[in-house]
């Protein structure tokens, strides 16, 4: 079995674990339609920052 040679300090242990927890994705609400979407992405109905930028099937 593998055995550590030297004890890992609390600082190094913290740095090792620093990226382990997950953060929630930043969510934005489209002001014109109220749709929820990822920030800096076009909403499902084709709006970005209050303007229609993509034609959808319903248009």
From Swiss-Prot:
- UniProt key word Ribonucleoprotein: yes
Which Gene Ontology molecular function entries are recorded, alphabetically?
A: structural constituent of ribosome
Q: Where is this region: Disordered?
A: 1-59
HAMAP family per the record? Ribosomal_bL32 (MF_00340)
Q: Where is the composition biased (Basic residues)?
A: 49-59
* Gene name per UniProt: rpmF
> What superkingdom does the record give?
Bacteria
Task: Extract the InterPro entries matched here.
Answer: Ribosomal_bL32, Ribosomal_bL32_bact, Ribosomal_zn-bd
Return the GO cellular component terms, semicolon-separated. Answer: large ribosomal subunit
Which keywords does this Swiss-Prot/TrEMBL entry list? Ribonucleoprotein, Ribosomal protein
Q: Please, one GO biological process term?
A: translation
Concerning its family, UniProt says: Belongs to the bacterial ribosomal protein bL32 family.
Q: Which Pfam families match?
A: Ribosomal_L32p
The protein's name is: Large ribosomal subunit protein bL32
């Amino acid at each position: 079995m593998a055995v550590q040679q030297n004890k890992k300090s609390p600082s190094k242990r913290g740095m090792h674990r620093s990226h382990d927890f997950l953060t929630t994705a930043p969510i934005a609400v489209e002001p014109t339609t109220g749709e929820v979407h990822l920030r800096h992405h076009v909403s499902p109905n084709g709006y970005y920052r209050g303007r229609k930028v993509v034609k959808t099937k319903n248009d």
